[in-house]
Amino acid sequence: MKYIIVIPARYKSKRLPGKPLANIGGLPMIVRTYNQCSKVVSKSKILVATDSNKIKKVCDEYKIKSIITSNKCLTGTDRVAEVAKKIKCNFYINVQGDEPF
């Protein structure tokens, strides 16, 4: 059974722009979300999907696998669906990028 956790992360949120990079206790929110996921699965099974080069850069700095997706995705689920077209798995687990705890 092949699966991955996909963490969709959008930089241009309407209510809180840049939310995935918000500092929470010294770490960007997206890094905290990734760290929580890594407690239950191998880091090789986690991927951040984003339309933002800023988020991609932070992921690179923390050695988090990431992929740039279209800025036309309206929802996180749309972003996961785009990943599914590029990476073949049996299951895609969608963990929202604003779940740092």
Model-derived features with residue positions:
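Short phosphate-binding loop-to-helix
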Residues: 47, 53-101
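N-terminal glycine-rich phosphate-binding loop and ensuing alpha1 helix
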Residues: 2-49
